[in-house]
A protein has these predicted regions:
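Intrinsically disordered, low-complexity polar/charged tails and linkers
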Residues: 1-152, 166-167, 172-175, 183-238, ...
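A eukaryote-biased signal for long
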Residues: 220-297
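Short glycine/threonine-rich beta-strand-turn micro-motifs
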Residues: 157-164
């Protein structure tokens, strides 16, 4: 956003003024080494970057640097549909009834908006997270920072996915959707067989396996990692083949031109990417992978 909208000479002069410097030998390095707070100051001094440009950039990359989600079953006892506006009204009403500790680590879960893509509702939310620190006087204090998160509701396919939500708030949302849809909301456990069916073992680069009751001469947990792991399976000691996979990473093709590292937390049903994507890329990839997982069952 900075490079595309501000002339290089202006970037240099404004940033040097903020930093109290007179010159730089490498403008690109200078910009890339700055903190978020400094870059915000630069944007605030740059009328070229309008509110609409900021809003557009936010919408494009709204899912963050490492986008992902935790996937839940929504096992319904009856078929119940809720229109978009009714869904928005009910979740706002529910959130208004929640109570939090004044000094709690997470609090003030609030509704932001609801949009629909395909047959999925995306509910955007925000909450406050507490960060403790020592101030300039050496005193312990804290500050609350607003965090954004979202819920994808694919009730027609019996799933709900949540992003960037701490467990204590996630549990509150699970209760809400359980009551709203008369559904049992449970984590999808990603089993060894599901991994074999949905993801290519040729693309695996890191695997952690666990056995709570291992043979006497074997480890309880083992992690193997290599950029060419599929070519080096013979290096793994025998006896661990039937252990449960708890965490794994793959080289993942996101679309025809983009690849990244996909991480899978099997017990929690959590998938995440180590690559920043546009909103459309992430939604398209997520929908495909969710359908792959749901389709397995």
């Amino acid at each position: 956003m900075i490079w595309n909208n501000i002339e290089k000479e202006l970037i240099e002069s404004r940033l040097l003024q903020i930093k109290g410097q007179s010159t730089t030998s490498d403008l690109t390095k200078l910009v890339n080494s700055q903190s978020r707070a400094t870059l915000i100051q630069l944007i605030e001094r740059s009328p070229e970057i309008t509110v609409s440009i900021i809003d557009s950039a936010y919408e494009k990359y709204r899912y963050g640097l490492k986008p992902g989600f935790t996937l839940f079953w929504a096992k319904r006892t009856s078929i119940k549909t809720v229109p978009q506006q009714e869904l928005a009204n009910k979740i706002q009403e529910y959130l208004s009834t929640l109570h939090y500790d004044n000094d709690g680590k997470y609090k003030n879960l609030e509704y932001c908006s609801t949009v629909k893509f395909g047959d999925i509702y995306e509910i955007s939310l925000s909450y406050l997270q507490r960060f403790n620190y020592i101030n300039a006087d050496g005193e312990f204090t804290f500050i609350y920072m607003m965090k954004e998160c979202f819920v994808w509701v694919g009730i027609n396919k019996n799933f709900i996915a949540m992003n960037n939500i701490p467990e204590v708030l996630m549990n509150s949302l699970k209760k809400f959707f359980s009551r709203l849809y008369s559904a049992d909301i449970t984590n999808i456990k990603i089993t060894n067989k599901l991994l074999e069916k949905v993801f290519s073992s040729d693309n695996a680069k890191r695997v952690t396996k666990h056995n709570s009751n291992p043979p006497e001469n074997q480890l309880e947990k083992i992690t193997v990692a290599d950029s060419r792991l599929s070519e080096k399976l013979s290096c793994i000691p025998a006896g661990y083949e039937d252990y449960d996979v708890t965490n794994t990473q793959y080289i993942e093709e996101i679309d025809g031109t983009t690849t990244g590292t996909l991480g899978v937390n099997c017990n929690k049903g959590k998938l995440y990417l180590s690559k920043s994507l546009t909103s459309s890329q992430f939604r398209t990839w997520s929908t495909r992978r969710i359908n792959d997982i749901i389709g397995y069952f």
